[in-house]
Amino acid sequence: MSTLLGWLGRLWFGSLGTARPDPSTAVAAAGSTDVTSTQDAWAVLSLVNEWVKHSEAKLGVVLAFVGVMAAGLITIAADIPCPSLVILCIEGAAAVLILASAVLASLGLLPRFKGQSEEAQMNPLFYGDVANHFKGKSEEYVTALSGVIGSQDALIRQIARQVHANADVASRKYLWANRSILVGMLGLVCLFVLAAGVALGW
């Protein structure tokens, strides 16, 4: 039982409580980018972006599954003219769990707009920072981006920061997907119990 509870705890809470070091700090401390090329940094960013896409696809599948469960619940409920108190309770539990699963999946799909408030921490490769710091200042953004691109050290540092941010986004999306799946499975159990109750005349 303790093993099961531990697994459910890890599934629900994930590892968001563990602080991750900023990779741009490690790049700055190294003082040289001879080992890591700019192409390698872009490749790592592309890989992390694929993780984000996969997590969003997973959330989309979960939402579709939740929609099917909601349709099933409506169909079963519509076929019961005079439900008993037991059936009503099961229907209510199933509805709450299905709705909660949909909300959890939707939270995972919400985009992240917040950027760095400090100018020194601004990343010209992140759309949130671009929108916050360069709204209506296209020429200033061109200058800032050119300054980053013109320095391999600065470019790799900014790419590393974006990799770090995107990895955090991906892990959070997977966490919300896991939570939605867990709650959705409980809703599915309620649907099976409801169907059995209707068949047995509860």
UniProtKB/Swiss-Prot annotation:
It is a multi-pass membrane protein. One of its GO terms (molecular function) is nucleotide binding. The chain crosses the membrane at residues 60-80, 85-105, 181-201. It comes from the Bacteria. It is found in: Cell membrane. The keyword Nucleotide-binding applies. Keywords: Antiviral defense, Cell membrane, Membrane, Nucleotide-binding, Transmembrane, Transmembrane helix. One of its GO terms (biological process) is defense response to virus. The keyword Transmembrane helix applies. One of its GO terms (cellular component) is plasma membrane. Pycsar (pyrimidine cyclase system for antiphage resistance) provides immunity against bacteriophage. The pyrimidine cyclase (PycC) synthesizes cyclic nucleotides in response to infection; these serve as specific second messenger signals. The signals activate the adjacent effector, leading to bacterial cell death and abortive phage infection. A clade D Pycsar system. This is Pycsar effector protein PtPycTM. The lineage of its organism: Bacteria, Bacillati, Actinomycetota, Actinomycetes, Propionibacteriales.
